[in-house]
Regions:
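Surface-exposed, charge/polar-rich loops and edge strands
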Residues: 1-168
Length: 168
């Protein structure tokens, strides 16, 4: 069932005015003014909104660090829409290859998919920064063509011990 909600004003403006930035529960506190700036990454993109949280694996990176990495190797970016499920604890009990996580959306551009596929074809290594990125790349791998597929997609995979990596 779909519910449509209409607002008298721009939803992004409304969220900025009355919303509160979600931060990881392990910080053990409410969001602070400083978090709006600090809890961003060098990969933040105001043109592609949609994340409920920053991909925390890259919080320590700054522009200078990223430039050094780009001088040493090829870098491609994908768009991650980190979902609210990232704040949920794992369910108690057995975790196995059938376990599914919360679903998160991502977008891989054609140029990023081409770079990744060329790297794989030439027996190069693909390094993922963070588990959300890793889940996206592994989910985007097509078993038939053995290529990473570009475009908007989503993932709910849970990578656990014994997982056979196809991209990274």
């Amino acid at each position: 069932e779909t519910v449509e909600i209409e607002f008298d004003q721009d939803i992004e403006k409304l969220c900025a005015e009355i919303g509160q930035m979600p931060i990881p529960p392990y910080l053990g506190r409410e969001a602070e003014e400083l978090d709006v700036e600090r809890y961003q990454t060098v990969f933040a993109n105001d043109e592609r909104l949609g994340s409920a949280a920053a991909p925390t694996a890259s919080l320590h990176m700054d522009d200078e660090f990223l430039k050094k990495v780009e001088q040493a190797t090829q870098v491609c970016k994908i768009n991650l829409n980190v979902g609210y499920g990232t704040f949920e604890p794992l369910a108690d009990g057995l975790i196995d290859s059938a376990t599914k996580l919360h679903e998160e959306d991502y977008y891989i551009s054609t140029s990023s998919a081409d770079l990744i596929n060329n790297t794989l074809e030439n027996k190069g290594k693909v390094l993922s920064v963070g588990t959300t990125t890793l889940r996206a790349l592994e989910s985007a791998f097509d078993q038939k063509s053995h290529k990473v597929i570009s475009g908007p997609q989503s993932t709910d995979i849970f990578i656990s011990p014994g997982y056979k990596f196809k991209v990274c």
